[in-house]
Amino acid sequence: LAGVNKNLGRKPQGNDRAQVGGVIAGECDLAIANTYYFGKMFTGNGGKNPEQIEWAKGVNVIFPNQEGRGAHINISGIGLLKHSPNKPNAIRLMEWLASDMAQYMYANENFEFPVKNGVPSSPLVTKYLSGGKFKGDSVPLATIAEYSKIASELVAEVGFGR
């Protein structure tokens, strides 16, 4: 982590798309970003950021650990509060969101990987981000969470990004 910190091309700033913009501007050679932003960039973010189409075309996405454990995948989740006033409808919504149709729609609109096995990623993600090949890390989030405190301590110890 200390070595990565020393090699930063610029102080961390902005959102994921700003990191790609930094590569395009020549401020750094490599950036870390969530891949679903590439889907938004390839589509110009619904016409709001047409310049980002060229940004997305100007970089290559590299997934780490494809020969080993695979790359971490962020997920979107849903939960039901204990004191929710309308539990039956909340459960119906949760069941629908876990359905193949909803997972497919979400993946195609938001460019995230579906959380349900067997539901395909959006064609854009498959074509541009993984070349049709992607191996996700299967480490449970609870296991990752066990290391959250020590990870935060290491970031503080090396003064990451300062």
Region locations from a protein language model:
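Non-transmembrane alpha-helical segments in soluble domains
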Residues: A2, V20, I24, I32, ...
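Flexible, solvent-exposed loop/hinge segments that line or gate ligand/substrate-binding clefts
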Residues: Q52-N86
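Mature extracytoplasmic/periplasmic domains
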Residues: S76-S138
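Extracellular/periplasmic bilobal clamshell ligand-binding domains
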Residues: P120-R162
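Ligand-binding pocket segment of bilobal, Venus flytrap-like solute-binding proteins
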Residues: L1-P64
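Soluble non-cytosolic domains of exported or imported proteins
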Residues: Q13-R17, I32, H83-P88, D100, ...
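Solvent-exposed loop/turn segments at secondary-structure junctions
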Residues: Y36-G39, Q66-R69, P85, S99-D100
